[in-house]
Amino acid sequence: MADALILARALADPTSLALDTDWAGLVTMARAEQLLGTLAWRLHGLPLPEDVALLLSDARAAAENGRRTALWEAEMARRALAPLGVPVVLLKGTAFVAAGLAAGQGRSIGDLDILVPREALDAVEAALIAAGWEWVKPDPYDDAYYRRWMHELPPLIHAERDRMIDVHHTILPLTARVRPDAAVLIADAVQLGNGLSVLSPAAMIVHAAAHLLADGDLAGGLRNLWDIHCLYGEAAEDDPAFGLTLVEEAGRHGLHDAVVRALRLSQQLFGTQVRAYESSGRIRLTPRWSDRLFRRRLLARDDWGRATRPVTRLAFYVRSHWLRMPPAMLARHLWIKWRRSKA
């Protein structure tokens, strides 16, 4: 059975694709992994079957529309929060396109994600609600859980534009075993000149690796790993010693192992040119046996776009909850959620 390795190879080396490629399978995989716009950008200008070329042209147009929408939402948030005088850091896809980074080319962008100081959360929430955003989660338990334990406010959606915003005060749940220093992330952010900022190049990768390996179950992880590939390649091109800057930043936030594993996986799947520092132990790229399990999870997609390898996916789902909270809290949380679902 096919897996998403064909998609990873197509992204890494578009010229390797033959005209008789299983285009239907490749496109279906890319759509399921939210990488269709990215694939369309990577294949632009190459000889393609006519129907594939038309489909990918539409995908590029859709990605461009998504880019404009994301930037407009960022501007709306900026206007709502400007009177507060608090730093507002764009995260994820919106940050990539706002900063003009390669990782933003064709990228699928969903919610607007921002990072603000924790002490400003109440004021930020009030300002957004006054500007037309409203709560998505009316359930009192979910609302209380977010506010006490999560790294973000309960999600908000704009009443007229139907666009969501996630307001973060750090990058991992407060229950996680790792506690990144959000104050450092905000202090080191790069100003865009319009009242908004983005994380530093190293912090962007740290955040992406945290989201990929220290928080979630790797669902949609191929897109996150492609982000890391692009971000690293662009930063290392400007600074050959960027790898050392990156691992220093990762260590500051307790995410050294996650970042190094992400670099290994990116190298293995996309051929990312990462300079190793084996002797110092700072960047060891020698494959680990467990890397195979992560690759197996990342590539768990068939040419019909269906998720495959259910046992592997379940194992990583359990792992994600184990990383997010202590066992006793996890058991209590799952029990409450199960009981409420039966009510």
Residue ranges of model-derived segments:
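Conserved NTP-donor binding/palm subdomain of two-metal-ion nucleotidyltransferases/polymerases, i.e.
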Residues: 1-110, 116-343
